[in-house]
Amino acid sequence: MLPQILLIGATGRTGKLVLDEALTRGHLVTALVRKPNSSLPQHANLTTVTGDPCNATDVEKALRSTRLGVPVVIISTLGQTRTSGNPWAAPSSPARFMDASAKAVLAASEAVKRGPPVVQIDKLVVMSMFGVGDSFANLNILLRWTFNHSNMDQTLEDQTLVDQTVRNGSLPFVLVRPVILNEAEAAPVKVYASSAEGVSFMPKVSVKSVAKFLVDAASKGDWDCTAPVIAN
């Protein structure tokens, strides 16, 4: 049985691609969005729930909107934002935004496990990043300098907290660590250990490839309770 997906971050760059990929593969999808969004597709397998991803009550509402009897996988593609793509651009999201959402997801998951009715959650799949945890040591010197001297440090700090929160939670997880993102077409990915040992000097992966991998991680058990680094 295909798991159904609760998608958090469906209106973002990667989230939109995850949504399209999941629907194409036949998954039932519930998207938690902050406000009604006309950019989401009209699809028989898509349910939209309005709410705050950092509010456990709203996340619980979304989980209880899923179809009973079908296991749920939660995918989060939330990310820190800045006023532009420049690493030194001012942050436009709260400093601990992603970690607040991870905590809300875990709290809501505990609530729905108690029922009634009971919602079966198989795992939590999070789009993390290359540089978190033990992968930081394998960033090249240019990337390490950028993380240490630009506003990307807020993103790394938040993702590091998410990593810790999810590992300390009660759900099985996959913490996917994509390398440098680009807009190329989807291509096969190479999966590295969490440390990213063996990646090239300036590794790249397309956003489309990441979206496909996140949906793969939702439906397969190959990477459960790990933090795979992925690159094309």
Segments predicted by a language model, with ranges:
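N-terminal Rossmann NAD(P)H-binding glycine-rich loop of SDR-like oxidoreductase domains
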Residues: 2-28
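Eukaryotic N-terminal targeting leaders
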Residues: 1-6, 20, 39-42, 231-232
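Hydrophobic anchor at the start of a short beta-strand
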Residues: 29-30, 173
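Glycine-/Pro-rich loop/turn segments that contact NAD(P) or position catalytic residues
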Residues: 85-186, 190
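C-terminal/domain-terminus segments
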Residues: 183-204
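Mid/C-terminal beta-alpha module of Rossmann-like enzyme folds, strongest
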Residues: 2, 13, 198-232
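NAD(P)H-binding glycine-rich loop region in Rossmannoid oxidoreductase-like domains
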Residues: 31, 37-112
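SDR active-site strand-loop-helix element
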Residues: 8, 32, 74-78, 124-130, ...
